[in-house]
Amino acid sequence: MAQAKGMDQPKSTRYQNRCIGITGASGTLGCALTRCFRASGAEVVGLTHRTPPEGQDDEGPHRWISWQCGEEAALDAELAQLDVLVLNHGINPKGGQSIDDVNRSLEINALSSWRLMQRYEDISRRNVREKPMEIWVNTSEAEIQPAVSPVYEISKRLLGQLVSLRGATRDPNERNQLIIRKLVLGPFRSDLNPI
């Protein structure tokens, strides 16, 4: 007698049913990450400096949160709900090298990510979970090769150095509670990097 085949079961993915927060979610990489995480069954939260888009689509974040550089502490309650935080925001002043360009780039590209990283790490210490929390930090190709914009390069290299420094000084318990992933991508065309 023939036996019925078992029903196909959806494959479980590493990020299925996990909550992923992405800064810079409306940029080229942020959109691509959002699509990938959604396809693997994750809930995606976009963190934006802009007014959040109205309505939803099947490819964007499930919800949006507004935030501002310098006001990272206001995100603590939201950060505590995340399993993975992807720090992917930034600006490129192109050829601008004024004091304002330098200050703005350092603040947005390096210091705001550094503060968010510290806050998320502190949350991971108080919020031990079955699976470790993760933080992904996009430092940019400017960390490993010259960028067209010197100010962009300096600010992204600073972030990369801070992430490396912090990663090297964590104890084994901290490493088990929070995984730090440093993303150093090759150049790709985007609004931030139109070349």
Predicted features by range, described:
Residues 22-39:
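N-terminal Rossmann NAD(P)H-binding glycine-rich loop of SDR-like oxidoreductase domains
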Residues 86-95:
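Conserved NAD(P)H cofactor-binding loop of Rossmann-fold oxidoreductase domains
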Residues 39-56:
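Conserved glycine-rich Rossmann-like NAD(P)H-binding loop of the short-chain dehydrogenase/reductase
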Residues 95-109:
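Short alpha-helical oligomerization interface
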Residues 108-130:
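Amphipathic alpha-helical dimer-interface segment in Rossmann-like NAD(P)H-dependent oxidoreductases
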Residues 23, 47, 88-89, 132-142, ...:
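SDR active-site strand-loop-helix element
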Residues 51-73:
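Rossmann-fold cofactor-recognition segment
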Residues 94-99, 125-174, 189-191:
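Catalytic loop of short-chain dehydrogenase/reductase
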